Amino acid sequence: MTFVPSKIFFTKGVGRHREYLSSFELALRDAKIEKCNLVTVSSIYPPSCKRISIEEGLKHLSPGQITFCVMARNSTNERNRLIASSIGVALPADASQYGYLSEHHPYGETAEYAGEYAEDLAATMLATTLGIEFDSNTAWDEREEVYKMSGKIVKSFNVTQSAEGDKNGLWTTVISAAILLP
């Protein structure tokens, strides 16, 4: 049996609780995926996989369902500590080819910075598999132009959640996820 997902949606959430596990559960609830048994997989965006809205994606989920995902997750109970989770996405111009998803879970990075970093990771992984020539020492903005001008990478984006650690020391958890559907 071969299972290649045909649909994908992206979600994110944040949760705060005195218990670590409960803060994760609340982040899953905020992301609207708490009812699934999540199985994390590596970072390939399947060929010809259609991105759908979270509202459409949720219609395909049932309580207890085994659900494949790529997830970035981060937690802290340090007051005011900045945390983030980000999924970067890079898609090839040829939809019959696979793309890349990257996970990034930093401390001390803003949502914007973490998102750009995750997007850069995914785009760089895709560029290397497509044989695009680039200087890895240049800034992301410059490489993004090179990637897109090559005509081989059509789109890149990120889905990022950030939060500051709770001021009272509660556990704070952030998640970002790509949910893969049949």
Curated annotation (Swiss-Prot):
Any Pfam family the entry gives: PvlArgDC
The protein's Enzyme Commission number: 4.1.1.19
Cofactor binding, per record: Binds 1 pyruvoyl group covalently per subunit.
Cofactor requirements of the protein: pyruvate
GO annotation terms (biological process): arginine catabolic process
Gene3D superfamilies: 3.30.60.30, Pyruvoyl-Dependent Histidine Decarboxylase, subunit B
InterPro entries: Pyr-dep_his/arg-deCO2ase, Pyr-dep_his/arg-deCO2ase_sand, Pyruvoyl-dep_arg_deCO2ase
Catalytic activity: L-arginine + H(+) = agmatine + CO2
Residues the record lists as Pyruvic acid (Ser) modifications: 43
Site positions for Cleavage (non-hydrolytic): 42-43
MF GO annotations: arginine decarboxylase activity
Keywords assigned: Decarboxylase, Lyase, Pyruvate
Family: Belongs to the PdaD family.
Database matches in PANTHER family: PYRUVOYL-DEPENDENT ARGININE DECARBOXYLASE
Name the UniProt record assigns to this protein: Probable pyruvoyl-dependent arginine decarboxylase
Organism encoding this protein: Chloroherpeton thalassium (strain ATCC 35110 / GB-78)
Source lineage: Bacteria, Pseudomonadati, Chlorobiota, Chlorobiia, Chlorobiales
Gene: pdaD
